[in-house]
């Protein structure tokens, strides 16, 4: 189907009302829109995030570290409501000039170290604590291969397929077909890799799995975009096997609900400041 009713202007101008439900999450310029400092809790690591796939990567990693007894990985997870423009506060922009979640401050250093971009945070935590990134050069490189594969693939799955299939106010056949093809190609790449290995980068659970699961694991398990049937997710049997196994890890079950503001109330922990919050402060408890 061809729709030629839209003709781009010679010079694009921003229509603030055109973004619909997403009008407040982005702008064509950078920098803060308002003055507001970020809160700081009691733990060494201060995370400012939202429970999207990119946010889940980091909270899963932190919960995995804590599960190993790494006390230095204790963290406060502060909710950044991107629909309300929290990411454009002066405090947040100071941590991440790109105004995207997640963003991390490590207060074990003076001055604190800022870390932004989810892949960078995973790598920082892996190197800081010495877990989930192999020391062997070949294994480390393979892990990095897949971490960067995800960083390149996620925009096609999320901003491309997820947006036009699930969120866009108008269903555009060309856009959906284009990004569905790429989503399925990426799933096939991952499926073939997992046919040969228990985890994405080999036989070890690494930051590659933590990066990829919130995107591709959630998609095939029906956790995002309501697209599992449309994508014929059941046909990717190796991705299904891996997604279910990783999803059963206790740290993944915890990490995936931190800073989450949608879905079942018992799977929403808006902020995490203590391990006990998983038992006492999920939204079903708070609203019950």
Curated annotation (Swiss-Prot):
EC numbers, comma separated = 1.8.4.-, 1.11.1.-
Q: Where is this region: Disordered?
A: 260-288
Q: Which residues bind glutathione 1 per the record?
A: 52-54, 87, 101, 117-118, 151
- Basic and acidic residues bias locations: 268-288
Residues annotated as domain GST N-terminal: 46-133
Q: Which residues form the GST C-terminal domain?
A: 139-265
Q: What class of enzyme is it?
A: oxidoreductase
Cellular component aspect of the GO annotation? cytoplasm
The residues that hold glutathione 2 are 26, 178
Q: Name one GO molecular function term.
A: peroxidase activity
Under InterPro entries, the record lists: Glutathione-S-Trfase_C-like, Glutathione-S-Trfase_C_sf, Glutathione_S-Trfase, Glutathione_S-Trfase_N, Thioredoxin-like_sf
Q: Which domain of life is it from?
A: Bacteria
Keywords, sorted A to Z: Oxidoreductase, Peroxidase
- Give the matching Pfam families: GST_C_2, GST_N_2
Main function: Exhibits a robust glutathione (GSH)-dependent disulfide-bond reductase activity toward the model substrate, 2-hydroxyethyl disulfide; the actual physiological substrates are not known. Also displays a modest GSH-dependent peroxidase activity toward several organic hydroperoxides, such as cumene hydroperoxide and linoleic acid 13(S)-hydroperoxide, but does not reduce H(2)O(2) or tert-butyl hydroperoxide at appreciable rates.
Q: How does it assemble?
A: Homodimer.
**Assigned protein family:** Belongs to the GST superfamily. Nu-class GSH transferase family.
Tell me more from the record. Binds two molecules of GSH in each active site; there is one tight and one weak binding site for GSH.
Its name, as the record gives it, is: Disulfide-bond oxidoreductase YghU
Species lineage? Bacteria, Pseudomonadati, Pseudomonadota, Gammaproteobacteria, Enterobacterales
